[in-house]
Design a protein with these regions (language model features):
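Hydrophobic beta-strand scaffold residues
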Residues: 110, 198, 219, 278-279, ...
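Flexible, glycine/charged-enriched surface loops at secondary-structure junctions
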Residues: 69-74, 109-114, 165-174, 222, ...
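Glycine-rich phosphate/diphosphate-binding loop of Rossmann-like nucleotide-binding domains
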Residues: 144-232
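Adenosine-phosphate binding glycine-rich loop
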Residues: 161, 253-355
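Short glycine/serine/threonine-rich phosphate/pyrophosphate-binding segments
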Residues: 147, 182-187, 241-245, 263-265, ...
Length: 355
């Protein structure tokens, strides 16, 4: 398939495919939009079944980053990178050095950060080869943004509860979290600390065991968690879990989670609206991490960083009001708002796929 014919290609400015046999690196870097500034987005390390799956993911993720950064009012465009492999088995320092070289070759068009499957330490290795990296341990650029991602989702959940249920209180509420890795675990802790009950699942047994032992979450299987009766469903693992297949089985009033690309297709937002389920668009509610990264770069103090996260519930309330007033789904309302902030895209995007 020609890249321009890919269903998820959306006038991306550049797509770079990397196949470095010396380093054992198979990766893709996608830059969606740099209208507001250099494309900032994390590097996901995941065992995709094939390159086509990786391409679909990176195209969708990079577009989501354009929306996320725009709605967070950050001076960045949207980009993403993915590495094909198992991060628990295949990681090598030389891979991240090679990734750094590829990022550097883009001359500042893309700024890489950590994401699912990568760490601040991995980004430190990338930084050996390029300054276009954020989230680096023991440097002015900071470290792990996942606690801020979790806090942003938490604030989003409270906003959704206030809008949909009349009170933002989590006391006595039930939340089902799919995925209790770094972000999901931190979110579960915040909810438990406010008196909420947490059901949780994770395909990686040690992560679920830790959440059970330390937080008292109630375990569920990774599939059953989606149909668990609850006030809030929080997808915090991989995307695509809210789809035509799963929507009829959902037993929740609100969806608000940290996972990217939660909807299988754009039409799933309308299907949720028809069922009376309030969906918090993922690129709105999970923006805490990228907001944190920016304030790490600026050297902001803790109070400033915390206040910056208030844009998440503020955005959601605006989106909810638009969706209610125009009788449209919240995903559509959020995308429209992002497009207004992004403004007119560049007129001469240069798309490439270089091996």
């Amino acid at each position: 398939m020609n890249l321009h014919d890919h269903p998820d290609f959306d006038a991306h400015e550049s797509v770079t495919c990397i196949n470095d046999q010396r380093a054992g690196l198979k990766a893709i870097i996608a830059v969606h939009n740099t209208h507001l500034g250099p494309a900032l987005g994390g590097c996901r390390y995941f065992p995709y079944g094939n390159t086509a799956q990786a391409m679909t993911d990176v195209l969708r993720l990079s577009r989501g980053m354009s929306y996320k950064n725009a709605l967070a009012r950050l001076p960045f465009g949207g980009g993403k990178s993915v590495i094909i492999g198992d991060p628990r088995r295949d990681k090598r320092d030389v891979q991240f050095e090679a990734l750094g070289e590829a990022v550097h070759a883009l001359n500042g068009q893309y700024v890489v950060a950590e994401d699912s499957g990568t760490t601040p330490e991995d980004m430190r290795i990338v930084a050996r080869k390029t300054p276009f990296v954020s989230g680096v341990e023991d440097s002015a650029s900071g470290g792990d943004p996942s606690p801020s991602t979790a806090l942003g989702v938490f604030k989003g959940i409270k906003a959704a509860l206030a809008h949909h249920c009349g009170s933002e209180s989590l006391a006595g509420k039930t939340v089902a979290i799919q995925g209790v890795g770094k972000v999901g675990f931190a979110l579960a802790r915040l909810i438990r600390n406010e008196g909420g009950t947490v059901f949780a699942s994770d395909l990686y047994a040690p992560s679920l065991d830790k959440a059970i032992a330390e937080l008292g979450v109630i375990p569920r299987t990774h599939d059953d968690i989606l149909s668990q009766p609850c006030d809030v469903l929080a997808p915090c693992a991989m995307g695509g879990v809210i789809s035509a297949t799963t929507i009829p089985t959902l037993n929740t009033r609100i969806i608000a989670g940290a996972a990217n690309n939660q909807l299988g297709t754009a039409s799933d937002g309308e299907a949720l609206r028809q069922r009376g389920i309030l969906y918090c668009p993922d690129f709105v509610v999970n923006a805490g991490g990228v907001i944190e990264i920016q304030h790490q770069r600026l050297g902001s103090d803790a109070l400033t960083r915390s206040k910056a996260l208030e844009i998440i519930p503020a955005n959601l309330m605006q989106i909810f009001a638009t969706a209610d007033g125009e009788h449209i789904d919240t995903e559509r309302a959020a995308v429209a708002l992002a497009h207004r902030i992004l403004g007119k895209p560049r007129s001469n995007p240069a798309t490439q796929c270089a091996a």
